[in-house]
């Protein structure tokens, strides 16, 4: 692919803006309570096993920790993004939707799976059974679709920075989010229709209930689980692997391009230069790029001004390289966590749909409880990966809550020494007339 030098600089600048945002938000993975209370309730109630106190205690402890972290983390994300107007970017709008679905998933999944599992009885009634299964499925679906949307948005911002600007707007993001919620509520309508309480007799001859999602036939049950496996795991997983794989490849090529540019700069003293200012170096997610300006600064190449400019260029190049490498590592983590959290529960559901007896025999009780717990973990990991690892978000958090020390408004502070260097550059430029420099942006 051959581009003019001016176009290459513009594309590279846009790409690095997105890399910054990626590192700042650090997505993928999402939550999950598997679609169905029936999973845990069936495995744990249909064939009760002798309870072990230490297993119950460990289960309660782990569920409580994950629940508290999920509620606290997602609530903080929602609060910061709503109250801080400066953080309402396109990607943050998707992250807000992700936090809402994660919070809803946590509230509707964990208590209504853990309590019946411990009591060996679904005590909440038929209406709650239908409602919780419906919101469980919807929250899982919305979370997954949000992750896919974030991966595609990042792909467009990094790999197609010029073309994607047409549709990377807040209004477009809101339309996509509204569509994902409407689609999810529509897809999951079978849950309130076919979820019911099923009575059974426990070992002590007492009658109890379990909340189960039962379709009229085994063929329909198998088709439904296959459908969910495709749209909520396999296809989203493939899309994210491809999108993040292409992003990583693009960034790797950018690293090689930077290395070649650095080598050329050593061999030939440059007469012109441009640099991409980094507002955050932990960036996981890129800001809207500003078209780079081509400045003829021969007059500034002498004395302390030239020395300072050369140091800034070198620092910016190093920051770009570090940011790209961090994004690649972050994307690998996102994909690995997505499959780690989702694969066990979807595999268990598919197994149960096609071989109920064998699945219940091997997964009943503790195994399915901890498989579900693993899927829940993603709802508390998402805020950490996508938000709290983002320097701008942390600054926004401290600005939102007065009780926290506030080092400055988000998006103002950058690398160590960068703010001072930026002021120095502006001061140096102000000493010279615009007749000594070209400020026209390169053609797209």
UniProtKB/Swiss-Prot annotation:
GO terms for biological process: animal organ regeneration; axonogenesis; cellular response to hormone stimulus; cholecystokinin signaling pathway; eating behavior; feeding behavior; forebrain development; G protein-coupled receptor signaling pathway. It is found in: Cell membrane. The lineage of its organism: Eukaryota, Metazoa, Chordata, Craniata, Vertebrata. Pfam families: 7tm_1, CholecysA-Rec_N. Receptor for cholecystokinin. Mediates pancreatic growth and enzyme secretion, smooth muscle contraction of the gall bladder and stomach. Has a 1000-fold higher affinity for CCK rather than for gastrin. It modulates feeding and dopamine-induced behavior in the central and peripheral nervous system. This receptor mediates its action by association with G proteins that activate a phosphatidylinositol-calcium second messenger system. A lipid is attached at residue 403 (S-palmitoyl cysteine). Disulfide bonds join 33-44, 129-211. Glycans are attached at residues 25, 39, 205. Pancreas and brain. Also expressed in the gastrointestinal system and vagus nerve. The keyword 4Fe-4S does not apply. It comes from Rattus norvegicus (Rat). This is Cholecystokinin receptor type A. Belongs to the G-protein coupled receptor 1 family.
């Amino acid at each position: 692919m051959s581009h003019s030098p001016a176009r290459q600089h513009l594309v590279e600048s846009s790409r690095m803006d997105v890399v910054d945002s990626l590192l700042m938000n650090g997505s993928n993975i999402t939550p999950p309570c598997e679609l169905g209370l029936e999973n845990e309730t069936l495995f744990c109630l249909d064939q009760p096993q002798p309870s072990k106190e230490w297993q119950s205690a460990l289960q309660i402890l782990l569920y409580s920790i994950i629940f508290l972290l999920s509620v606290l983390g997602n609530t903080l994300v929602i609060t910061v993004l709503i109250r801080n107007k400066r953080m309402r970017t396109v990607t943050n709008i998707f992250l807000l939707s992700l936090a809402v679905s994660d919070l809803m998933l946590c509230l509707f999944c964990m208590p209504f799976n853990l309590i019946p599992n411990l009591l060996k009885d679904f005590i909440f009634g038929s209406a709650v059974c239908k409602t919780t299964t419906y919101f469980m499925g919807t929250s899982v679906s919305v979370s997954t679709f949000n992750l896919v949307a974030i991966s595609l948005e990042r792909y467009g911002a990094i790999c197609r920075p010029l073309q994607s600007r047409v549709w990377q707007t807040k209004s477009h993001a809101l339309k996509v989010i509204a569509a994902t919620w409407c689609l999810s509520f529509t897809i999951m309508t079978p849950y309130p229709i076919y979820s019911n309480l099923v009575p059974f007799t426990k070992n002590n001859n007492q009658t109890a209930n379990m909340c189960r999602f039962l379709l009229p036939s085994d063929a329909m049950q198998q088709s439904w689980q296959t459908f969910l496996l495709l749209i909520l795991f396999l296809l989203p997983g493939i899309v994210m692997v491809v999108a993040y794989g292409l992003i990583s490849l693009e960034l790797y090529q950018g690293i090689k391009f930077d290395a070649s540019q650095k080598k050329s700069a050593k061999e030939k003293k440059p007469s012109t230069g441009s640099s991409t200012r980094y507002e955050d170096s932990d960036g996981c997610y890129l800001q809207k790029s500003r078209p780079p300006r081509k400045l003829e600064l021969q007059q500034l190449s002498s004395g302390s001004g030239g020395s300072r400019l050369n140091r800034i260029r070198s620092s910016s190049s190093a920051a770009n390289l570090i940011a790209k490498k961090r994004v690649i590592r972050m994307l690998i983590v996102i994909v690995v966590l997505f499959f780690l959290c989702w694969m066990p529960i979807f595999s268990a559901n598919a197994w149960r749909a096609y071989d109920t007896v064998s699945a219940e025999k091997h997964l009943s009780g503790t195994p399915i409880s901890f498989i579900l717990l693993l899927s829940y973990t993603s709802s508390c990991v998402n805020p950490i990966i996508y938000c709290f690892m983002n320097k701008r978000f942390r600054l926004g958090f401290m600005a939102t809550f007065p009780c926290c020390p506030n080092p400055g408004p988000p998006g103002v502070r950058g690398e160590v020494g960068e703010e001072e260097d930026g002021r120095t550059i502006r001061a140096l430029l102000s000493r010279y007339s615009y007749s000594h420099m070209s400020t026209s942006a390169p053609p797209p």
